[in-house]
């Protein structure tokens, strides 16, 4: 009788604690992803504004923009690509794909004005595209891809 009562009390205590722990862990994980997305978006906006104000999309040798891209890529231990309006990669923080053409659904959507992000929970990474919009004309002159 005492063993049965003890087993029931254990089940009543352990099951709710296990459910609570599962909910807490998943909530924390989702919040961490949202913070990462917001932080990437903020840095992406800074890079986008820098690309427009320095004229980087026409002259990609500007050291201020190159150092900012490299610094943000190092902070997030990720990769940043800058694509011009001809879908040519003009900057790759890994320096592997520069000069090549990048055609992807996400980039095309960004040229239409959408900010996209893709979350791969299994491999634990976020990929984000940010349009580079010219301040005077409002025309999208490029896309930043961050992951």
Predicted segment positions?
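Short regulatory alpha-helical segment in sensory/regulatory domains of signaling proteins that mediates
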Residues: 69-76
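Extracellular/periplasmic ligand-binding regions of membrane signal-transduction receptors
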Residues: 37-63, 78, 82-97
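Extracytoplasmic/secreted envelope proteins and their assembly/folding machinery
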Residues: 41, 48, 66-69, 129, ...
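Extracytoplasmic/periplasmic sensor domains and loops in membrane signaling proteins
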Residues: 63-67, 88-126
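Extreme N-terminal signal-anchor transmembrane helix of membrane signaling/transducer proteins, especially
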Residues: 1-26
């Amino acid at each position: 009788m005492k063993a049965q009562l003890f087993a029931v009390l254990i089940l009543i205590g352990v099951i709710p604690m296990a459910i609570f722990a599962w909910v807490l862990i998943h909530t924390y994980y989702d919040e961490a992803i949202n913070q990462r997305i917001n932080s990437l978006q903020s840095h992406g906006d800074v890079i986008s504004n820098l690309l427009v104000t320095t004229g980087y999309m026409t002259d990609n040798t500007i050291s201020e923009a190159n150092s900012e891209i490299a610094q943000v890529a190092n902070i997030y231990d990720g990769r940043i690509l800058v694509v011009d309006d001809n879908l040519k990669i003009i900057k790759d923080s890994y320096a592997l794909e520069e000069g090549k053409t990048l055609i992807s659904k996400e980039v095309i959507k960004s040229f239409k004005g959408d900010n996209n992000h893709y979350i791969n929970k299994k491999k634990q990474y976020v990929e984000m595209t940010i349009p580079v919009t010219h301040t005077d004309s409002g025309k999208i002159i490029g896309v930043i891809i961050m992951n």
